[in-house]
Amino acid sequence: AAAHAPRIHDGKISVGESNVRWCSDGFEISCHNREKVRVAFSLDCCDREAMSWVATTKGISSELIRDLMLQALEDRFGAVEGAPHPIEWLTDNGSCYTAQNTRSFAKDIGLKPLTTAICSPQSNGMAESFVKTFKRDYVAFGDLSDARTVMAQLPKWFDHYNEVHPHSALKYLSPRMFWRGI
């Protein structure tokens, strides 16, 4: 049996500095033609930027999660081989996150994989909150005709969330405004 990631659940997900803890989760968007788009994302647990995301009409694989991790790393630090210091990577217990090759890759690039307690989605409340916000403020107003149309809108939605969407926890700044110290 594969070893499970260590768990944390200290009741607080947010941290006081960027690039200390990142969280990740996924969600599904149902299209009017019955197609489904599955999205996984990573958030910084301080500034709440959606640093990276992946989307597919199939299942979220461990390979897509490894791509997601690498994109987050490159978003924050440029083209580097690994994080300049260990960064916690908080996820639920989905198979794409707990797969041995995903956990090994995370460690190889300087991420410390941590999982929430089983049956405890509130343990990753920041990611859960992002999903609610994204579905309420973007998906609900988007063109959901088919998967191709939805996937074409995702870059604009994520960019708007990062550049414009205010957060009460960030004194009503957007994630990138907060990250830039504006």
How would you describe each model-predicted region?
Residues 21-76, 87-88, 116:
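A short, conserved beta-strand element enriched in hydrophobic/aromatic residues
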Residues 80-99, 117, 173-176:
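Acidic/histidine-rich, metal-coordinating catalytic segments
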Residues 1-2, 55, 86-93, 108-126, ...:
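RNase H-like polynucleotidyl transferase catalytic core
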Residues 25, 42, 48, 69, ...:
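Mobile genetic element proteins and their domesticated derivatives, centered on retroelements
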Residues 26-29, 45, 93, 129, ...:
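Generic detector of well-ordered alpha-helical packing
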Residues 14, 107-111, 132-182:
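C-terminal domain-tail junction helix/linker
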